[in-house]
């Protein structure tokens, strides 16, 4: 059964990643109304008779979301049953399921009633939490923490501050990026790093949205770089922290490069999807560091309690 659960966890993680990228594809191609205002049917039909490209994209996104719902539900039930001895299992199972349902309902509401761009941006963020929760659940199932000796890890308050702070801030950056997409402000500023050569500062809403995201992205790049330097200097023996920040920096660097290329390639589809892919992976890595950080707090308390009993 454990072998089956491992395969299920991998397939579920990949399916949720496809859902995330599919949502970005729907937004990028303007396929949100590919099935009209009909849900769960498509243009009022179970199998639509008129298959335009927008309809195929929207319908494919709905199908992958539906399959993800089934897989996540099954994974949550089995992990709850067979891995309940691991402290985080129940919490992650609940988060995976609840946020998947929430993003499905928001997606349906957006189709039927329409939503403001600011609300639609939350849709991607909710999907991201469900994806990260399933990734962490998969890591627990594969016992990644044991391979990195994460169960005995103890971090200082400074490192935990950076982990929690960067993760929370990354979610804000994700929201600003999703807002850029839904406000259709991707090409509002045709130059980089300033808005344009003739007009370096933004003057209207779409330019402010775009430049706001750029500033937020630059700050998270600098913050992750700083945290990585601390990890390299002081956590070389703690492999999960050491490599966690190095991987995070690689991902945020790739994210920044692709973000710049989005501007200079006239928002090509490939660059837009890579932009969503890298931020999804980065957020999952940061969430894993958060989980390790909470374990560090527990480990520190247990060590302190043991030392007191010894005395």
Swiss-Prot record:
| Active site per database record | 58
Q: Which residues cross the membrane?
A: 7-27, 63-83, 92-112, 122-142, 160-180, 212-232, 244-264, 272-292
Q: What is the lineage of its organism?
A: Bacteria, Bacillati, Bacillota, Bacilli, Bacillales
Could you say which enzyme class this protein belongs to? oxidoreductase
Self-association state and partner proteins as the record states: Interacts with CtaB.
Report the GO molecular function annotations: metal ion binding; oxidoreductase activity, acting on NAD(P)H, heme protein as acceptor
Q: What is this protein called?
A: Heme A synthase
Keywords attached to this Swiss-Prot or TrEMBL record, sorted alphabetically, are: Cell membrane, Disulfide bond, Heme biosynthesis, Iron, Membrane, Metal-binding, Oxidoreductase, Transmembrane, Transmembrane helix
Q: Which of the residues are on side Extracellular? A: 28-62, 113-121, 181-211, 265-271
* Disulfide pattern: 35-42, 189-195
User: Where in or outside the cell?
Assistant: Cell membrane
Name the residues that bind heme b: 213, 275
Q: Does the keyword Oxidoreductase apply?
A: yes
Q: Which cofactor does it need?
A: heme b
Q: What's in the domain note?
A: The N-half (TM1-TM4) and C-half (TM5-TM8) domains are connected by an intracellular loop. Each domain is formed from four-helix bundles and they align in a pseudo twofold symmetry manner. The N-half domain is the substrate-heme O binding domain and the C-half domain is the cofactor heme B binding domain. The cysteines of disulfide bond Cys-35 and Cys-42 may be involved in transfer of reducing equivalents from quinol in the membrane to the active site of the enzyme.
Alphabetical list of HAMAP family matching this protein? HemeA_synth_type1
Q: Briefly state the protein's biological role.
A: Catalyzes the conversion of heme O to heme A by two successive hydroxylations of the methyl group at C8. The first hydroxylation forms heme I, the second hydroxylation results in an unstable dihydroxymethyl group, which spontaneously dehydrates, resulting in the formyl group of heme A.
Top-level taxon in the UniProt lineage: Bacteria
Any GO BP: heme A biosynthetic process
Main location as per UniProt: membrane
Reaction(s) catalysed by this chain's protein: Fe(II)-heme o + 2 A + H2O = Fe(II)-heme a + 2 AH2
């Amino acid at each position: 059964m454990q072998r089956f659960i491992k395969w299920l966890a991998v397939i579920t993680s990949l399916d949720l990643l496809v859902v995330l990228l599919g949502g970005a594809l729907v937004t990028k191609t303007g396929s949100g109304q590919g099935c009209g205002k009909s849900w769960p049917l498509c243009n009022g039909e179970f199998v639509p008779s008129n298959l335009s490209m927008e309809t195929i994209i929207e319908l494919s996104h709905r199908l992958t979301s539906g399959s993800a719902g089934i897989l996540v539900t099954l994974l949550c039930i089995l992990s709850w049953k067979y891995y309940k001895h691991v402290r985080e299992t129940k919490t992650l199972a609940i988060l995976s399921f609840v946020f998947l349902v929430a993003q499905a309902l928001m997606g349906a509401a957006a189709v039927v009633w329409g939503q403001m761009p600011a609300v639609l941006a939350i849709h991607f963020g909710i999907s991201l939490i469900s994806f990260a929760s399933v990734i962490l659940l998969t890591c627990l199932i594969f016992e990644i923490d044991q391979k990195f000796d994460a169960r005995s890890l103890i971090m200082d308050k400074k490192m935990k501050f950076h982990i929690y702070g960067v993760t929370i801030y990354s979610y804000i950056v994700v929201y600003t990026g999703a807002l850029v997409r839904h406000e259709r402000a991707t090409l509002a500023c045709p130059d980089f790093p300033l808005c344009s050569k003739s007009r370096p500062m933004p003057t209207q809403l779409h330019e402010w949205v775009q430049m706001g995201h750029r500033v937020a992205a630059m700050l998270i790049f600098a913050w992750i770089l700083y945290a990585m330097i601390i990890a390299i200097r002081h956590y070389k023996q703690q492999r999960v922290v050491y490599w966690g920040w190095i991987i995070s920096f690689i991902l945020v660097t790739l994210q920044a490069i692709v973000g710049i290329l989005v501007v200079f390639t006239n928002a090509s589809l490939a660059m837009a999807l890579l932009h969503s892919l890298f931020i999804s992976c980065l957020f999952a890595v940061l969430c894993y560091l958060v989980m390790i950080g909470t374990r560090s707090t527990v480990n520190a308390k247990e060590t302190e309690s043991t030392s007191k009993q010894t005395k």
